[in-house]
Swiss-Prot record:
Membrane topology per record: Multi-pass membrane protein
Subcellular location(s) of the protein: Cell inner membrane
Entry's EC annotation: 3.6.1.27
UniProt organism field: Thiobacillus denitrificans (strain ATCC 25259 / T1)
Entry's family note: Belongs to the UppP family.
GO CC annotation terms, alphabetical: plasma membrane
Source organism superkingdom: Bacteria
Protein name per Swiss-Prot or TrEMBL: Undecaprenyl-diphosphatase
Amino acid sequence: MADLTQILHALILGFVEGFTEFLPISSTGHLILAGQLLGFNGEKAKVFMIAIQLAAILAVVWEYRVRLRHVVSTVHTEPASRRLVVNLMAGFLPAAVLGFLFYKEIKGYLFNPIVVASALVIGGVLILWAERRKHVVSTPTVDDLGWRRALAVGFAQALAMVPGTSRSGATIIGGLFLGLSRKAAAEFSFLLAIPTMFAATAYDLYKNWQLFDAGDIPLFAIGGVASFASALFAVRTLIKFVSRHDYTVFAWYRIVFGGVVLATAYSGLVDWGVTH
């Protein structure tokens, strides 16, 4: 049975996953750093991360349930539905292939706080650069997106296999570079998350199924509920936010947060579990 400390950790990490999964600030990076600070790492933490990520995906499915139901029921009759399915397949492909080929290397060498912090800073600088460019909109809605640009967004998404990069950040900023409107870039990022994250979660489950323990189910449920609720809030909030604002605030957050982690790591003020 989970004790109070474990329950608190589950709630904190669930909220961290949900809030950060669909913001351009890297959920994986935040989970690695939060887990290190809380001392919640190791095999149980690895399985727990899979569970709360699944809950975050389900929040997007719930938010877009009407649209997804319509696409599934009309994919054989409506060109717009077929186009969205093709675009999602094109966007999913790069990360699927590269993730399968380099799964062991990514999990073994890149999942550490210094990589995360460095990627946060670099990603923040790239977002600032993207926001200072003149943004010409050639694709105002997701329905206007073609498969070639969807594939290009998919290659941007593949960069997010480096923890700290941010899947949503890479796809949204990639979409802006390719001429998508802010809302279209955010919506396509959310929709692309569904096949991408389901596949990644399923593959993680396949690789780590032996680590599951029935006794941990209550803890997973607590974290999952927190992740689902906060992810739903984050998705709805970001869609409203991007219709009126740019991503500069997220860029500065990444730079400051990543800089603090690097400074505390190399000064020895915080033990991030790495040697230097």
